[in-house]
């Protein structure tokens, strides 16, 4: 029986290779052509380039827009700016390195840069993830009024922005200190938490379960509960005003928005959660590394589609962006449903 060569400390390839020196396949030293043809790497490079350009542009524009237009700086818009900062974090620290590495077909920047890139991209991704949960919670708090006549003020908005960063640091720091680690993932051209190696030295299984519970199940449960309560509240309001066409239209549009928001979250994080759980439950089995690249790509792509869902579908933000970029002043309907859904401060104005 052929002896299986020992894996290198800084990377892991879950497929059999007819070679005793796995260091010769190091993703920090040589192109990873044994994992796929050059066309796949070039396609991924182009994809990451567009994600970088699109993600950086739309999120910088959101931040600049908020700075320029005072009416966008409401307390309940703080978290949307926080989401844009998190997306910008991923777009700047994750996508460019991946783009250049895919172009060279290996992680050309070395093991130390891999740890840094993995940490920063994970940090930004987790901040964005928790920001989506906070968006849902704040809307539930203001629209459903579970605390009665509650006024959402600056301290609440600031706390809502700080919480995602604390939660993200709690999730992204452990691999730097021995609980799991950051290594090349998928086609070995980008880095992230180690969720598929068989090395028990890093306790990867427990870290994966921690991420699944704390960074997927809890935020997703929060989003489903809060938006579910919001829909129930609006349905009751629509039932009470059955003769109002605008109320009925509002309920339909809110329902569509909620579905889009929940699907956006699932597209971003469900592949990571499901694939990592499959790896943990099928420890040591071979799998296609090209499939392992998909979750990373979808999470990085969220830097583009999350702003579209949460910012560009907001009439106030969209109008201000058009005015800033094109000089056009689009007339807003302040009573519109889109404003009620994405600019929730209009539902419960401050006293």
Curated annotation (Swiss-Prot):
Q: Which InterPro entries match?
A: GPCR_opsins, GPCR_Rhodpsn, GPCR_Rhodpsn_7TM, Opsin, Opsin_blue, Retinal_BS
| Compartment annotation | Membrane
Topology with respect to the bilayer: Multi-pass membrane protein
Query: Where does the record locate the signal sequence feature?
Result: none
N6-(retinylidene)lysine PTM positions: 300
Could you state one GO biological process linked to this protein?
visual perception
Q: Which UniProt keywords apply?
A: Chromophore, Disulfide bond, G-protein coupled receptor, Glycoprotein, Membrane, Phosphoprotein, Photoreceptor protein, Receptor, Retinal protein, Sensory transduction, Transducer, Transmembrane, Transmembrane helix, Vision
- Between which residues do disulfide bridges form? 114-191
Write out the transmembrane intervals.
41-65, 78-103, 118-137, 157-180, 207-234, 257-280, 289-313
Q: Which residues are glycosylated?
A: 21
Q: Which GO terms describe its molecular function?
A: G protein-coupled receptor activity; photoreceptor activity
Stretches of the chain found on the membrane's Extracellular side: 1-40, 104-117, 181-206, 281-288
Its domain of life? Eukaryota
Describe, from its UniProt entry, the tissues in which this protein is expressed.
Answer: The color pigments are found in the cone photoreceptor cells.
Q: Could you tell me which Pfam families the record lists for this protein?
A: 7tm_1 (PF00001)
Its PTM note reads:
Phosphorylated on some or all of the serine and threonine residues present in the C-terminal region.
Query: According to its record, what are the GO cellular component terms?
Result: membrane
Mapped to this chain, the residue ranges on the Cytoplasmic side of the membrane are 66-77, 138-156, 235-256, 314-351
Listed PANTHER family: OPSIN
By sequence similarity, the record places it as follows:
Belongs to the G-protein coupled receptor 1 family. Opsin subfamily.
Give the function comment from the record. Visual pigments are the light-absorbing molecules that mediate vision. They consist of an apoprotein, opsin, covalently linked to cis-retinal.
What name is this protein filed under?
Answer: Blue-sensitive opsin
* Source organism of the structure: Carassius auratus
């Amino acid at each position: 029986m052929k002896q299986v060569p020992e894996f290198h400390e800084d990377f892991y390839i879950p497929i059999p290779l007819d070679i005793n020196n796995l260091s010769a396949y190091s993703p920090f030293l040589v192109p990873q052509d044994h994992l796929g043809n050059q066309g796949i790497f070039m396609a991924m490079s182009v994809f990451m380039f567009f994600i970088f350009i699109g993600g950086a542009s739309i999120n910088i524009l959101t931040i600049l827009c908020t700075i320029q237009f005072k009416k966008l700086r409401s307390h309940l818009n703080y978290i949307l700016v926080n989401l844009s900062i998190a997306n910008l974090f991923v777009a700047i620290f994750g996508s460019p390195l991946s783009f250049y590495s895919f172009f060279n077909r290996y992680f050309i920047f070395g093991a130390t840069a891999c740890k840094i890139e993995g940490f920063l991209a994970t940090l930004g991704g987790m901040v964005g993830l928790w920001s989506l949960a906070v968006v849902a919670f704040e809307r539930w708090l203001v629209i459903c009024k579970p605390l009665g006549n509650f006024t959402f003020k600056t301290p609440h908005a600031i706390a809502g922005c700080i919480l995602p960063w604390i939660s993200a640091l709690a999730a992204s720091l452990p691999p730097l200190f021995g609980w799991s680690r950051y290594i090349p993932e998928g086609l070995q051209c980008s880095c992230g938490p180690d969720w598929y190696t068989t090395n028990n030295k890093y306790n990867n299984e427990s870290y994966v379960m921690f991420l699944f519970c704390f960074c997927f199940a809890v935020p997703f449960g929060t989003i489903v509960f809060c938006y579910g309560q919001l829909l129930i509240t609006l349905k009751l309001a629509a039932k009470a005003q059955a003769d109002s066409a605008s109320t009925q239209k509002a309920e339909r549009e809110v329902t569509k928005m909620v579905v889009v928001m929940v699907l956006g979250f699932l597209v971003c994080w469900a592949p990571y959660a499901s694939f990592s759980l499959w790896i943990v439950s099928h420890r040591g089995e071979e799998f296609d590394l090209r499939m392992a690249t998909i979750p990373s790509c979808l999470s990085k792509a969220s830097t583009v589609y999350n702003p579209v869902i949460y910012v560009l579908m907001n009439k106030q933000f969209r109008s201000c962006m058009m005015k800033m970029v094109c000089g056009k002043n689009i007339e807003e309907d302040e009573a519109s449903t889109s404003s009620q859904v994405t600019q929730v401060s209009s539902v419960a104005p401050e006293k």
